[in-house]
Amino acid sequence: MSDVSGTVHDLFTTLNKYGGKRLRPALVHLFGGLVGRPTHEHAALGAIVEALHLSSLLHDDVLDGADTRRRLPTLNALHGNEIPILLGDLLYARAFTLTLTLSTPDASRELAEASVAICRGEIEQSFLRFRPDLEEAAYFHMFADKTAALSGAPCSLGAIYAGAAPRQVEIVRGFGVSLGMAFQIIDDCLDVV
């Protein structure tokens, strides 16, 4: 974000130290190339989905009371809950502002739907947390919303902006959702082990 300075810039510098796989931007480009020809908009889409992902991680760390992420102190551990929530909101707003530069409103629609699903999943998780009687179907439904929505959207957006047919978009979105579910299951297992 080239228009930030001072404290906000310092917070972004700290956030950048967490690294990460940058999987979602890679999915945008991968599926853009698989179903058509990637355009200049795929680079913007990659930045948009990564900003939304980072926003969700900042909020998730606060909700979970996480002290570390990737072996570094979380922003909420360093600055309390207010700063990461506001920084997450800033990333979220900037991501949606960037969607306005794209040739169609498809990204805004897809990402708004994914955002609703993420919030719905977080609410469900808050109510279902630490329940030993949690049924498998409820677990998968919760994470289909919470995690998988933001894995399906990059795949579908990569395809949409490369000119894919609606059926192709549904197929690649389904792949992304399945990938997100698999990642969440592995992540949960690692929390237990």
Language-model regions, residue ranges each:
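Mg2+-dependent prenyl diphosphate-binding active-site environment of isoprenoid biosynthetic enzymes
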Residues: 2-193
